[in-house]
C-alpha cells in the first residue's frame, strides 16, 4: 500500500487559470450566501434558523455548501469552530458567518462578522485591529516568503496590541477542490509561497 495523499496534495497546490476562475465564481456565490444571512438577521431567529435560510437559498440555485454552514452569535462567535445551536441572535452582539459554496467542483470558504445593533467602542477597536492584521498579511504575502512569515506578519499586529493569547488559530489555508488545501498559513510552516497557490 502506497499513500499517495502527499503527492496528490502537491499536484493540487498550484492552480491553473481555469481553476482560479472556478474558485472566483464559488467565491461570488459565497458572498451571495452571506448576503442571504445578513438579510435574515432578526432577534427572533436562532443561529440554526439563519443557517437553514442560507443553505436553502443556495440549494434553490442548484449549489451545495462546501462544508457545514456556521452562524454563531454572542460568546459562541468567539470560537473559531463553534457549533451552531438554537441560540437566538443577540442585540448589540457580534454575529459570525463561516460558509462556502461548491461550484463546478471547486470550493469557496469565507468568514464574515457583523454587528447586530450598534457596536460599542471595544468591538470597533477589535474590528479595526483585525483589519490591520489582515492587511499586514496581504501586504506581506508574495512568492518566495514562507507560510510562517505570512502568519507572523498578521500575528505581530495582534500581539503588539496585547491580544496575542487570543489568536488561537492559524491565519488561513488554501482552497481548491477541497475546502482545506495547502498551504496552511500558520506558525511553523516553512512551505514557500508560490505563484498560483490559492
Kindly give the residue locations of the regions a language model identified.
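Active-site neighborhoods and metal-handling regions in enzymes and metal-associated proteins
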Residues: 1-198
Amino acid at each position: 500500500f502506497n499513500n499517495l495523499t502527499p503527492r496528490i496534495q502537491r499536484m493540487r497546490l498550484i492552480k491553473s487559470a481555469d481553476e482560479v476562475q472556478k474558485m472566483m465564481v464559488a467565491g461570488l456565490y459565497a458572498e451571495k450566501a452571506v448576503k442571504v444571512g445578513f438579510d435574515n438577521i432578526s432577534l427572533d431567529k436562532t443561529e440554526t434558523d439563519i443557517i437553514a435560510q442560507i443553505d436553502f437559498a443556495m440549494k434553490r440555485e442548484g449549489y451545495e455548501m462546501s462544508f457545514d454552514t456556521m452562524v454563531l452569535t454572542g460568546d459562541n462567535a468567539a470560537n473559531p469552530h463553534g457549533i451552531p445551536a438554537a441560540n437566538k441572535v443577540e442585540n448589540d452582539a457580534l454575529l459570525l458567518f463561516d460558509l462556502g459554496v461548491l461550484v463546478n467542483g471547486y470550493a469557496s470558504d469565507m468568514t464574515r462578522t457583523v454587528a447586530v445593533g450598534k457596536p460599542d467602542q471595544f468591538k470597533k477597536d477589535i474590528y479595526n485591529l483585525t483589519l490591520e492584521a489582515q492587511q499586514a498579511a496581504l501586504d506581506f504575502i508574495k512568492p518566495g516568503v514562507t507560510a510562517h512569515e505570512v502568519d507572523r506578519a498578521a500575528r505581530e499586529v495582534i500581539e503588539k496590541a496585547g491580544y496575542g493569547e487570543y489568536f488561537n488559530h492559524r491565519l488561513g489555508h488554501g482552497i481548491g477542490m477541497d475546502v482545506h488545501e495547502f498551504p496552511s498559513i500558520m506558525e511553523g510552516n516553512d512551505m514557500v509561497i508560490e505563484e498560483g497557490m490559492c
